[in-house]
Amino acid sequence: MSASRFIKCVTVGDGAVGKTCLLISYTSNTFPTDYVPTVFDNFSANVVVNGSTVNLGLWDTAGQEDYNRLRPLSYRGADVFILAFSLISKASYENVSKKWIPELKHYAPGVPIILVGTKLDLRDDKQFFVDHPGAVPITTAQGEELRKLINAPAYIECSSKSQQNVKAVFDAAIRVVLQPPKQKKKKSKAQKACSIL
C-alpha cells in the first residue's frame, strides 16, 4: 500500500446550514441534536481510495458574519472546498454566489469547490413547511443551475440526519483532488521559436 496523501478539505457556507452536522455525520455516523455555532474544529479521517490511503483533513468553519475576518485563515493550503447551503433556505442558496464564491475566489483562487445542498430530509417534509411558512425549498434543478453558474465540478444533495449521500459528498471531494477535471486548453497563438545566433 502506498504512503498516504494528505487532502485538506474545508467546509464553508452560511451559519446553521449544517456544515458541522455533515462532518460529524461523516466521521462518527451520528447526528448531533443540539445546535452549537462553530468557531473552528478540525477532524481527520483515513480513507482508502483505489488501494491508496488518503488522510482527509476536515476543517469546519463558522459562517456567521462575526467570523468574516478570522475564517479565511483556515483557507490556506486547502485542496478542496465543500460549499454548503440549506435546501430549505433561499437566503443560504443566494449567498453561495453573493458571498461565498467572491470570498473563495479572493482568498483561494483555483481551488475546486463541491457544491452541497444540505437538509434533504426536510425538503420533502410537509410538516416542516407548515411549521415554517416562510421557508422556501430549493429544487435539484436550481442546485444544478447554481453548480453551472459557479463552475463547480459536482453538486450533491444530502441529509446528515438520515446519512443519505453523506459519503458521496466526501468521495466527490477526494475524487476532484486526486483526479482533477481536465481543463479546456485555450488556443494559444503560434509559439515563437527561439533562435540562438
UniProtKB/Swiss-Prot annotation:
A lipid is attached at residue 194 (S-geranylgeranyl cysteine). A motif (Effector region) lies at residues 35-43. GO terms for molecular function: GTP binding; GTPase activity. Residues 195-197 form a propeptide. The keyword Cytoplasm applies. Gene3D superfamilies: P-loop containing nucleotide triphosphate hydrolases (3.40.50.300). Keywords: Cytoplasm, GTP-binding, Lipoprotein, Membrane, Methylation, Nucleotide-binding, Prenylation. Its main location: cytoplasm. GTP binds at residues 13-20, 60-64, 118-121. Expressed at the tip of pollen tubes. CDD domains: Rop_like. The modification Cysteine methyl ester is found at residue 194. InterPro entries: P-loop_NTPase (IPR027417), Small_GTP-bd (IPR005225), Small_GTPase (IPR001806), Small_GTPase_Rho (IPR003578). One of its GO terms (cellular component) is cytoplasm. It comes from the Eukaryota. It is a peripheral membrane protein. The keyword GTP-binding applies. GO terms for biological process: small GTPase-mediated signal transduction. It is found in: Cytoplasm; Membrane. NCBIfam families: small_GTP. Inactive GDP-bound Rho GTPases reside in the cytosol, are found in a complex with Rho GDP-dissociation inhibitors (Rho GDIs), and are released from the GDI protein in order to translocate to membranes upon activation. May be involved in cell polarity control during the actin-dependent tip growth of pollen tubes. Belongs to the small GTPase superfamily. Rho family. This is Rac-like GTP-binding protein RHO1. It comes from Pisum sativum.
